[in-house]
Amino acid sequence: MAYVRLTSLAVLFFLAASVMKTEGGLPTCGETCTLGTCYVPDCSCSWPICMKNHIIAANAKTVNEHRLLCTSHEDCFKKGTGNYCASFPDSNIHFGWCFHAESEGYLLKDFMNMSKDDLKMPLESTN
């Protein structure tokens, strides 16, 4: 009986180790680009089909291959596709993805409307 338990444990470890480095899901999103737009979440148009964003970034050789690829925040500003370049969690992907970080914009706008007196913090001593 102990051999059956050890055998099933060995099979479990073998299967877990074999799927550790695989990416889940298909690279395509299951639709074609309609007027350059994909309607599936986490997908973008890579003509003629919609592909997952991380697949587009992994296959790209330069930032200019897709309008949302970036290496810095400045790339997003220059392309006009956002104000924040977020990197993918996979370290093998050398490009990031441009986003519109609205909260950052609102914070900057609120900061610019503040007077200089608001920025000075009073020093209070508590004993």
From Swiss-Prot:
Matching Pfam families: Albumin_I_a (PF16720), Cyclotide (PF03784)
UniProt key word Secreted: yes
Domain of life: Eukaryota
GO BP annotations, alphabetical order: defense response; killing of cells of another organism
This protein's UniProt keywords: Cytolysis, Disulfide bond, Hemolysis, Knottin, Oxidation, Plant defense, Secreted, Signal
Cross-link named Cyclopeptide (Gly-Asn), sites: G25-N53
Disulfide bonds: C29-C43, C33-C45, C38-C50
One CC-aspect GO term: extracellular region
PTM notes: Cyclotide cter-M is a cyclic peptide.
Compartment list: Secreted
Record's signal peptide: 1-24
PTM-bearing positions, type Methionine sulfoxide: M51
Annotated SUPFAM superfamilies: Cyclotides (SSF57038)
Function: Probably participates in a plant defense mechanism. Displays insecticidal activity against H.armigera. Has weak hemolytic activity. Binds to phospholipid membranes.
Annotated domain remarks: The presence of a 'disulfide through disulfide knot' structurally defines this protein as a knottin.
Name by which UniProt lists this protein: Cyclotide cter-M
